[in-house]
Amino acid sequence: EVPKWLYDKAVVQYTDHKALFEAMQQSAPLDLRVNTLKATPDEVIEELTQHGVQAEKGQYSPECVRLNIKPALTQWPIYKEGKVDVQDEGSQLIARLVQPKRGEMVCDFCAGAGGKTLALGALMKSTGRIYAFDVNEKRLAGLTPRMRRAGLSNIHPAVIRNEHDLRVKRLYGKMDRVLVDAPCSGTGTYRRNPDLKWRFGEDELDRINEIQKSVIRSAAKMLKAGGRLVYATCSILQRENQDVINDFLAENPDFRLLNSYEILGKQGIEISPYQAQRFGDFFVMLPQL
């Protein structure tokens, strides 16, 4: 069961909307992201097996380990030692799209609790500098202990008032990579957050849509020449994804869209748009030199 407004939009947008809704009703497994600074997926699976927990590698992300049960993970040594963090496989793929390199300057523009920030930090082997921005001080506060547990020293969390904050403007033209994990309706997370479908109404779409467009505009200004901008949501709605990107590209003809699936494919991650749609959506853009 989904809200009528979402059903009406999905029917128009997806030819296979029935399969999509069925997938939404299934309970989600627990995905872990292995912190490769401290362990390998094989080592984590072996440790879990020794404790009688069945685990397997994820379908797409090289760092993903999937559990069929949802244990009190925070009490386990592998969690306390920073070997794993809880992160949906789709979110792990977004860090792979950013493809940060050692020593680069990176901004996670809407960092939230910092799950993707930590994934970026591990990919950068704790080198360079990552700015983790968010307007929610309470959510961002959880990042510092998680950083320490993960053994990362290259992350700099900062609370901002909005996307036009002076802290943001000071970094215009300085970033190698910027990730915009935009605030959204969360329609792609109903498997994990089933109550969300009744908390977010169609009337809020207009407001959140304006925020999405404003955030991506500001984030783009942070890039240096040859940088990379990644826009992602956990929404299945075209209005929050392709439409936002189309508007942005119309306003910014000096940017071009890359093929996200080719970027993942070159990293050995084979996933089709059909398989990816249950995670939400993502786009990679480059400013023209």
Where are these predicted regions, by residue range?
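S-adenosylmethionine
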Residues: E1-L289
